[in-house]
Amino acid sequence: MKNLRVVDLSKHIDPSNETRRCKLHRFNTGGPIPDFHTNMDLMSHLGTHVECPYHHNNNWKDVTELPVTSFMGRCVYIEFSDLEPNSYIMPEDLERASKGRIGKGDIVILDSKHKLEPFTEKTNTEEDKRLFICHDTAEWLRDKGVKCVGFGDGVSIENNNVDVCAFHDVLMEKDVVFLEVLKNLDQLKKEVFFLTYLPLPIKGLDSSPVRVVAIEGLAGFEE
């Protein structure tokens, strides 16, 4: 790992205070010889998770029907610093901020300076200044050929059903996956890097908790 920098972009989960379903039952199968196992009762959208097309349509692909390369690759991190609170991210904003760095098969993480933890009671209140996505945002990303879109705390995918549904429709129909509840993006030192986020290979899963890891400085995955 010489000359490489590794950043964990995952939410660490504590079942005692997690708001989404997360229950663990630990038991000893070995009697006098300790042999502990754990039954996990989890929801598929727990913590940092990758959502697959099956999440949005019963006829689209689940986590096992996508190639493993859908869950790793070259990533471009875009943090919008010049857009007003509660603005929509439009194609011209993406063109300007991406600086020609986004191509077919890339991963894109969208973020802004207007940060708020997602999926809380503060969502869509006066405190929520995050940027919005819409149909036009999705079309630009689709036309670029990206394979994954991730979201930092500065971009909302909860503002209204029309925008959120259109965003899913346009991208997931093309087998684009989504990365949600990303953490520690402020620890990144580069805007282009290698990213991996492998799901559990369980047939029928629409989404899976993932350990998202950025590797900076890997040859072939730089600007």
Which residue ranges define each predicted feature?
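Active-/binding-site microenvironments in catalytic and ligand-binding cores
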Residues: M1-E223
